[in-house]
């Protein structure tokens, strides 16, 4: 029996809605990254984008365990000499774009390259409870019910 390899034309993508309120950031990101890659499917093929489309709402209400809320630092470089910048998770979550914490956590769990960039385009993250994908009728995934540790204490 030959190994099954899915073709891009055979891929069936579902829409999944996840409410991130009260969920632990790393656990949420792991579940979403696996969904985006398609690793939850029996038809997973490493070189084909066969993951689902994921919509995350309430990304600003995600929970970081321990002292990560104040101590976790995000670094980036402007490209200019001496251009290293940093922000704490607290500054980002209380800033203009709190959904970036969730986006970066997921992005850094997806392999880098053309396929990873294509898979990241299947992710939509919203800071509030409203989203623009009602027309796709996303199926709700209760991440908190998958494992009791997925729900944060804060």
UniProtKB/Swiss-Prot annotation:
**One MF term in the entry's GO annotations:** mRNA binding
Quaternary structure, per UniProt, is: Part of the 50S ribosomal subunit.
User: What organism is recorded for this protein?
Assistant: Brucella anthropi (strain ATCC 49188 / DSM 6882 / CCUG 24695 / JCM 21032 / LMG 3331 / NBRC 15819 / NCTC 12168 / Alc 37)
Which regions form coiled coils? none
What keywords does the record list, in alphabetical order? Ribonucleoprotein, Ribosomal protein
| Domain of life of the organism encoding this protein | Bacteria
Would you name any one GO CC term? cytosolic large ribosomal subunit
Pfam families attached to this UniProt entry: Ribosomal_L13 (PF00572)
Q: What biological process terms from GO does the record include?
A: negative regulation of translation; translation
Q: What does this protein do?
A: This protein is one of the early assembly proteins of the 50S ribosomal subunit, although it is not seen to bind rRNA by itself. It is important during the early stages of 50S assembly.
UniProt-listed SUPFAM superfamilies: Ribosomal protein L13
Instruction: Give each disulfide bond as a residue pair.
Output: none
Question: What is the name of the protein in this document?
Answer: Large ribosomal subunit protein uL13
Q: According to its UniProt record, which protein family does this protein belong to? A: Belongs to the universal ribosomal protein uL13 family.
